[in-house]
Amino acid sequence: MLIYSSDPSDSHVAPYGGVSALMTPNPIAAGIPAQPWPILLDASTSITTAGLCERNHREGKRLPGKWLITPAGELSDDPAVFGPPQGGTILPVGGLDHGHKGYGLSLMVEALTQGLSGFGRPEKPTTWGAAVTVQVIRPEAFLPMEEFQAQVDWLVSACLNGEKRPGIAEIVVPGQREMIRRDEALR
């Protein structure tokens, strides 16, 4: 299952190469059955979230990287430059080097959520309202479930058992740590 979400009443992310906020961080979530854990992804199409910027600003903390861009086009790790009235925006995933990829993903989310719902930024909403698209793919429509599962399980196993970079103790799949915490909490 894939879930795309956007909020057309808010803007925190500029298009790649721009400085004016147009989009939200537009999360993409996915769940894929696998062993020993399902693959669970919840990822923003921006390099960070508006919530983290706002929290760090309240707590007087800087961001871990220069993930914001000022209205003058300068990079910053200071959350005080973020949002109104300062006008700073969050960079798309990939930052300045490869932000066209996050920008493309964000455009896809905006098109699939607001485009398919027929309501979005052109209507200039003034209150929060998520536009959501849920896409469910039934693997059995393409091949027997066992074959799909064998492919995904092999991929997960190859990732978990792959050679690690120096200093890396463990390779995990998205959602693995959360599933372990859930299993521990249920004991």
What are these model-derived regions, one by one?
Residues 6-8, 176:
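Short, ordered loop/turn segments at secondary-structure junctions
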Residues 25, 88, 100-107, 130, ...:
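Conserved active-site and cofactor/substrate-binding residues in soluble primary-metabolism enzymes
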